[in-house]
Amino acid sequence: IPNLVIRTEEGIFITENKVLINDFNKLPMPNRDLLDISKYMETRTIITSRGCVGTCKFCTTPYYFGKWNGRNVIDVVNEIETLITKYNTKKIIFLDDNATVNKQRMIEICKEIEKRNIKCLFGALCSIKCYDKDLLEYMYKVGFRWVHFGIETGSERLLKLMNKEIDINYIKQVIEDTKKIGYRIRTSFILDYPSSTKEDIIKTKELILSIMPHELRLHYLAYRVGTPIYNENKDILNKTQYIHSNKPNIKNNDLTNEINKLIKELEKENYNMVSNDIDWNIYENADKNTKIAAFTPIKYGMCWYE
């Protein structure tokens, strides 16, 4: 098997290096019969594209996959139909890095879902800078109920340093509009981006409390090889490839105190603070407006309803 890096007792072994297959449509549908998927969460995943048009400095996607590349619409909907008919799937999440980067393609996917009268609940990871109200309204019509926007900070200064290409007023408007459509919304925030100050955390707290997402994923930054932020800091920081680190990279009492204040404020606003994966079981049938915040990966498919 080419393109593998394997750690063995003798050391690190690298198999034949072959060029990445850029034409997504040459790849077969995943064979889910190779493992017992009934042992996993009931929300199934589908990847319909690779890459992203963004250039966020902390993200590997544009540097690993290169330009954005989407699968054929019919192929995508065939896989959706297979998940439903063969595996009795009720919920599917588009696990693309940015499912809505190509508006026309997503419209065509929705049209095909509608044409086949497919009944399923969907979720999608979306870049907030690619937000399109008309598109999300159509997606909602065919069964999409959940979206994830990576916002990362409430500081205009840090947004520019991250190269997010958005501003605070835009963020607030997008979240407000998306809520009105009816979506359950997850947002993510990085709390220890390099040069973060007490004031930056305060601004992040203010933004979170103003937009009140249903799900809040709180991160400490993972420095990933190949990203600009890694290259800028590789000689001075401890690096981790693990995105779910539970320790901040910046040792600063002011930052720590503000993060603790943020947690207390969230609890006052009736956010359920989740500390480990076991806790997800109690939210399986929770109300669709249940608010959750976590430093651990949040389970997909919770609180999705018609």
Show where each model-derived region lies.
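Flexible glycine/acidic-rich beta-alpha junction loops that bind and position SAM and/or redox cofactors
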Residues: G54, R157, L161-M162, L191-E199, ...
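C-terminal structural cap/anchor segments
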Residues: T178, D200-I201
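Radical SAM enzyme core and accessory elements
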Residues: P228-K234, T240-E306
